Amino acid sequence: MAASITAITVENLEYPAVVTSPVTGKSYFLGGAGERGLTIEGNFIKFTAIGVYLEDIAVASLAAKWKGKSSEELLETLDFYRDIISGPFEKLIRGSKIRELSGPEYSRKVMENCVAHLKSVGTYGDAEAEAMQKFAEAFKPVNFPPGASVFYRQSPDGILGLSFSPDTSIPEKEAALIENKAVSSAVLETMIGEHAVSPDLKRCLAARLPALLNEGAFKIGN
């Protein structure tokens, strides 16, 4: 395995260097991880930690355009993040809670950000509204104590798989499947795109990926 692939700890929550999903049987490497929070009455309150895992073919896909670029260049280039978001490879995103949140509390903010993005790019129609409703329904019975996680599995064909875990382990079954490419992309867009909820995660991706992109052939195998 590439030496540059290491685990990351965010607020005592560990993100392993490689994870294998029991849903797909595939392994994914950790692209980056970071905190997400809000400034409330002048204080920055950390709510969640987000880790973005990528299928190994992501390296070759991204290297075609971004090999040789520095971390500083990538951090300032929105197209780099958009290529992660829209790239023809699977992503597995783990959002683990630093503070307790109910499913509806958490999903409401995610949905607000997704809908705002979809409307801004003109891709919010009836199908997307229906997909967002399905998204909301999936979170209704869920509660997230500290350390609990949501997993978003994003496939290149636009399927978003949701699963919920009381800890950081990947569940064997998904709680919901949302078949809408625009909505699936919007979830990651709001995390690392133009109006990212986790600048920390964006910095981490830009810091870690250049070494991999410059290395060339990369396979984690399974």
Curated annotation (Swiss-Prot):
Residues reported to bind substrate: 48, 113, 190
Reported effect, residue 48 to A: Strongly reduced reaction rate
Superkingdom to which the source organism belongs: Eukaryota
Annotated keywords: Flavonoid biosynthesis, Isomerase
Note: Part of the biosynthetic pathway for all classes of flavonoids, a large class of secondary plant metabolites, many of which are brightly colored.
InterPro entries according to UniProt: CFI (IPR044164), Chalcone_isomerase (IPR016087), Chalcone_isomerase_3-sand (IPR016088), Chalcone_isomerase_bundle_sf (IPR016089), Chalcone_isomerase_sf (IPR036298)
Function: Catalyzes the intramolecular cyclization of bicyclic chalcones into tricyclic (S)-flavanones. Responsible for the isomerization of 4,2',4',6'-tetrahydroxychalcone (also termed chalcone) into naringenin.
Protein name (record): Chalcone--flavanone isomerase 1
Keyword Isomerase: yes
EC code(s) of this entry: 5.5.1.6
Residue pairs linked by disulfide bridges in the UniProt entry: none
GO MF entry, a single one: chalcone isomerase activity
Pfam name, any one: Chalcone
A GO BP entry: flavonoid biosynthetic process
Naturally occurring in which organism (per UniProt): Medicago sativa (Alfalfa)
